[in-house]
Amino acid sequence: GSEMCIRDSNGYITEKKFDIETMSGTIHVECLNSRATEFKVNIGKPSFISSDIPVSGEVREVIKENFVFHGKEYKATCLTVGNPHCIIFTDNVSAEAVKNLGPYVENTDEFPERMNLQICRQVDKGNLEIQIWERGSGYTKASGTGSCAAAAAAYKLGLVESRINVNQPGGMIQIDMEEDGTIYMTGTVGYIADISVAESFFS
């Protein structure tokens, strides 16, 4: 689920460039404006290799592979961008659809560490529309790594160019795919609520 909750933390930091240590490694972040509301994040390189994701079975790239979820067959592409994602391309991209399918994808035996799901529609060569089911959290209106995973899968399949706008209920994120495979995510942060955090949280 949340090994790489980068966008949630960025609104608290005002340095121009900085690193964030996550459960999946060090993430390099650049603040793009003086108000600290827009950030560019180096997510690293995705892997479609089953043992990296992980997906059970022989070691292979999990590209447009047939899976059965809740008695129905789907073609899915799976990858990791620091956490595991299953991408299903469909014309029916709705909250209801991902809520109905998400629990079955998350908990299938073929995904030993459970799985995040994005159902995705190619709008054109530069735009995708997604809905998100996050393992351990359920329906989610926005996900940075989910957007990166959907864009990387679409790019791998030749559906999009190297710059992709990923549209989700919580807003749009711009994804840039570099020639060496590195993913850059550019997005904004906004005020949601005031919270209190114990000092021990940071120790």
Which residues does each PLM region occupy?
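Short, small-residue-biased leader/transition segments that mark boundaries at the very start
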Residues: G1-I6
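Active-site proximal loop and beta-alpha junction motif in alpha/beta enzyme cores
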Residues: R7-K141, A152-S203
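Helical hairpin unit composed of two closely spaced alpha helices linked by a short loop
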Residues: T145-S147
